[in-house]
Amino acid sequence: DCYAGIWVNHASSTPDPETGKPFLSRPSSEEISGALGAAEAVGDDHIQERAKGHVDSDTWTHGSSEQRVRWFTTGMNSGSVQACNTFAVDASKL
């Protein structure tokens, strides 16, 4: 999720070598909202609640909706791989 955010950060500023123009235009607020909604929708808590009617955080493999949104936002706002180092943050901030 963090790396996806980094991609969003740089996608509109990476120039095409032939034209010198960015490959993509800057994402709109609606597109960013859609990306955040997608990150939220694939959170283990959201998936478990919909599939089983309850949440068991001991079985999560990809993180909660809140965690996934937070890491996407971290990557998007920072544009830095270093900001995505999950080993460098306290476990409560994963």
Protein language model annotation of sequence segments:
Residues 2-45:
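Short helix/loop segments within enzyme catalytic domains
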Residues 42-94:
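Pan-zinc metallopeptidase signature
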